[in-house]
UniProtKB/Swiss-Prot annotation:
Gene name of the encoded protein: cobT
Organism: Geotalea daltonii (strain DSM 22248 / JCM 15807 / FRC-32) (Geobacter daltonii)
The protein's annotated pathway: Nucleoside biosynthesis; alpha-ribazole biosynthesis; alpha-ribazole from 5,6-dimethylbenzimidazole: step 1/2
Reaction catalysed by this enzyme: 5,6-dimethylbenzimidazole + nicotinate beta-D-ribonucleotide = alpha-ribazole 5'-phosphate + nicotinate + H(+)
Function: Catalyzes the synthesis of alpha-ribazole-5'-phosphate from nicotinate mononucleotide (NAMN) and 5,6-dimethylbenzimidazole (DMB).
Protein name as annotated: Nicotinate-nucleotide--dimethylbenzimidazole phosphoribosyltransferase
Enzyme class: transferase
Amino acid sequence: MSLIDDTLEQIKAVDPALLAEAQVVLDNKTKPPGSLGRLEEFARRYVAIIADPENSDLELLGTKVVYTFAADHGVVEEGISLYPKEVTQQMVLNFLNGGAGVNVLARHVGAEVRVVDIGVDYYFGMVPGLVVRKVARGTANLAQGPAMTREQAVAALEVGIGLAAQAKKTGVTMLGTGEMGIGNTTPSSAIIAAISGKTVKEVTHRGTGINDAALENKIRVIEQGLAVNKPDPKDPIDVLAKVGGLEIAGIAGLILGAAANRIPVVVDGFISTAGALIASELNPHVKDYMFAAHESVEIGHSFMLQHIGLKPILDLQLRLGEGTGAALAMGLIEAGVKIYKEMATFAEAGVASE
């Protein structure tokens, strides 16, 4: 059995009884039932995900890690981005130096950022802190043919699965997804169009801030890519290989690995949710393990979230990526879990419950 098949086999729906038990605990806290709104939802879901009946002393709140996957895209040569692909490698170094948006917000919530070179078209050498899992030096131009081979897509999925398994062994109790890849809103729009049947125009936006003419070109390029490649919507790996990206595949794998290892995973924005969409098409139960950090201003994002069945935590008009929204949402999820852990019960506080 392959690593992917084995991982998919391990992913089961979260037990409704565990959700109910967590809610009973929350209802016994010194507050009216449900009065902490979605914080209770976050706590209930988190506790049910991470619960281990064989280990009652399991640490609920261990290490929080955002994995930021970096890769390049051949489709950039079609003029679909404001920025040259060299920005990908430059931003990787910025992440490693702690100077990017995700670094600032991760520090704010006490999370670690781990940067993964899964497909940057650049050789970094021995750079301290960089997790090197390069599958290829970027994808091919999806407008002219498949972005990658099926074997490359599988290898990138396996990178993410492996990182999640490693995280479990080292005491990580919450994962976040992030990415860096100039041009990566283009494959993300292609993925949602291929899987959902929405028109490209319905799910394609300005990415880094392109003008009207560039947006029309971007739509044309994606339509051409879908026509040339004919991805099979019933085969998520085919969609991923033909019109996806290496960092998107890594994110999908991380989500699958998180679900298989019962680790809550906070999904960032548009590109990360493209990975989540691939993961959920491979096994619908992964939805139980995901928290949608926010709803991006990218118009295709809401369609993705609806398709998976996720309700975003935040709406802050974010469109940066990197894992910025995931880092912010981690703080709110952790707040809910601390209510579950630390808030007094009626009996403990000597407060009447009725």
